[in-house]
Amino acid sequence: MTSTESSQPADRYVVVGNPVAHSRSPFIHAAFARQTGEAVEYGRLEAPLDAFADTMRAFLAEGGYGFNVTVPFKLQAYDLADRLTPRAEAAGAVNTMWIEDGLIHGDNTDGIGLVRDIQDNLDTLLEDKRVLLLGAGGAAMGAMLPLIECRPSRIVVANRTASRASDMLEEFVEAADSFGVELWGGGLDALEQLSEDDVCDVVINASSSSLHGEVPPVPAFLLGDGVLAYDMMYGAEPTVFLQHAAQCGARTADGLGMLVEQAAEAFYIWRGVRPRTAPVLADLRAALQAERKG
């Protein structure tokens, strides 16, 4: 996990998923390596759906230094780890792994990537703010502890199934109490019961709605002027949620910055060097736009 001179053979890392050909991680980590001078080789690895653990143990046994994990293997990665960080334990999933002292370590950098994008790239400090989190699946779970650690005044979780939101919040009551954060959860239909006094400063879509071209049923007054509407999904065009939020008057941002920031955290874990993310994010955004035009 120390810096490696560029004259030495490159240390090998991969992103593992199924499918994985679409992953932007090699683009990002190649840019980090050029910027920092770290001797890193980063590729893609498609593991069989029924052989994730065996595939990754073999990768490490053959000299691999570490790897990122994308769908559908984040829960299996959690089980593969010999040691878990507190944020991986809280998320119940792992996206970053490495060997240290002969043990496989697992972390989850998704949530810290989200809050760094919001606070550093979008200049929106979360302390004392009110946050509305849409969804209660794996993406939301990974975001909860890093959000709580930013000390917002309140986090509201709204999910299609109300009981799922309540169950998720129960996992974070102790952490929320220690940071002085109020938690509330319910079904998406409960948002209709909120008043304009309940408007949140930041609305984060952590649901899968954008994948299906659906807009979560969020009342328009919750997406008005002064609100940051954030979608964890990204693309060359704004998601349907962000298009809707913009029409309601909100400032909008997609999850591309989160992708870059979570990668930067993984790079730091592996190499002990923290890369600058702004130029990489700009280059990746430009590449997406070029692909759309091409």
Swiss-Prot record:
A GO-annotated cellular component: cytosol
List, alphabetically, the CDD domains matched.
NAD_bind_Shikimate_DH
- Name the chemical reaction catalysed here: shikimate + NADP(+) = 3-dehydroshikimate + NADPH + H(+)
The answer to whether the entry has keyword Cell membrane is no
In terms of superkingdom, the source organism counts as Bacteria
**Which residues does shikimate bind?**
23-25, 70, 95, 110, 234
Pathway listed: Metabolic intermediate biosynthesis; chorismate biosynthesis; chorismate from D-erythrose 4-phosphate and phosphoenolpyruvate: step 4/7
Enzyme Commission number(s) = 1.1.1.25
Q: What class of enzyme is it?
A: oxidoreductase
Query: Binding residues for NADP(+), per the UniProt record?
Result: 135-139, 159-164, 232, 255
InterPro entries per the record?
A: Aminoacid_DH-like_N_sf, NAD(P)-bd_dom_sf, SDH_C, Shikimate_DH, Shikimate_DH-bd_N, Shikimate_DH_fam, Shikm_DH/Glu-tRNA_Rdtase
Give UniProt keywords alphabetically. Answer: Amino-acid biosynthesis, Aromatic amino acid biosynthesis, NADP, Oxidoreductase
Task: Give the annotated active site.
Answer: 74 (proton acceptor)
Q: Which Pfam families match?
A: SDH_C, Shikimate_DH, Shikimate_dh_N
Is Magnesium included in the keywords of this UniProt record? no
GO terms for biological process, alphabetical: amino acid biosynthetic process; aromatic amino acid family biosynthetic process; chorismate biosynthetic process; shikimate metabolic process
Q: Name one GO molecular function term.
A: NADP binding
How does it associate, per the subunit comment? Homodimer.
Give the protein's function: Involved in the biosynthesis of the chorismate, which leads to the biosynthesis of aromatic amino acids. Catalyzes the reversible NADPH linked reduction of 3-dehydroshikimate (DHSA) to yield shikimate (SA).
What family does this chain come from, according to its entry? Answer: Belongs to the shikimate dehydrogenase family.
**What's this protein's name?**
Shikimate dehydrogenase (NADP(+))
What is the originating organism of this protein?
Cupriavidus pinatubonensis (strain JMP 134 / LMG 1197)
Source organism phylogeny: Bacteria, Pseudomonadati, Pseudomonadota, Betaproteobacteria, Burkholderiales
- State which gene encodes it: aroE
